[in-house]
């Protein structure tokens, strides 16, 4: 912080933040529900080599492209989100300023559950609950149409790929031919 403070004053940082409020971006990608189950470990079970724990609490947060959209929105950036799944979920809700476009409302949102030992704040286990996104011929034209709209209006497009098969190889072939810069983040358990 001292280095930042010496190099940039408050007014400079404020000007940069005000510029962010003028931006409009399009985020396309995998939504994820990040669930944290907190427990207190008690030791090994007497009847089997199983870790015995007492449940304390469970918290769920938006992850994947949902988290990216929330962070960008918190900086004042206008966000157009293209993803899948239902907008409202009993576990999380997005900021209502984020324009949510679901191209498949029936596809379940992947969930990653992490079991955390509260005593040491250490991750004991991680479980993935997901189905790969079913590819069909209707999805690619929908994505192309939405991307072309944002390209025509000179808006930045960011692809957020967590490996749940949302983007087909045909989509990547298409996007690689786009003459504007497209930023991509990929991360996968598959």
Residue ranges and their predicted role:
Residues 1-49, 54-190:
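Ribokinase/PfkB-type carbohydrate-kinase core domain
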């Amino acid at each position: 912080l001292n280095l930042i403070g010496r190099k940039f004053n408050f007014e400079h940082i404020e000007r940069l933040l005000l510029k962010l409020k003028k931006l409009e971006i399009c985020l396309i990608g995998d939504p994820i529900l990040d669930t944290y189950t907190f427990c207190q470990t008690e030791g090994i079970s007497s009847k089997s080599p199983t870790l015995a724990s007492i449940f304390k609490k469970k918290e769920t947060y938006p992850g994947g492209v949902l988290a990216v959209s929330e962070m960008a929105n918190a900086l004042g950036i206008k966000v157009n989100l293209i993803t899948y799944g239902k907008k409202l979920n009993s576990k999380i809700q997005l900021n209502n300023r984020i324009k949510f476009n679901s191209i498949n409302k029936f596809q379940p949102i992947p969930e990653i559950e992490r079991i955390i030992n509260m005593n040491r704040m250490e991750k004991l286990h991680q479980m993935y609950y997901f189905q790969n996104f079913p590819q069909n011929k209707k999805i690619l034209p929908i994505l192309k149409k939405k991307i072309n709209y944002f390209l025509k209006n000179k808006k930045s497009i960011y692809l957020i790929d967590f490996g749940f098969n949302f983007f087909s190889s045909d989509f990547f072939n298409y996007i690689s031919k786009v003459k504007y810069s497209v930023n991509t983040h990929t991360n996968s358990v598959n």
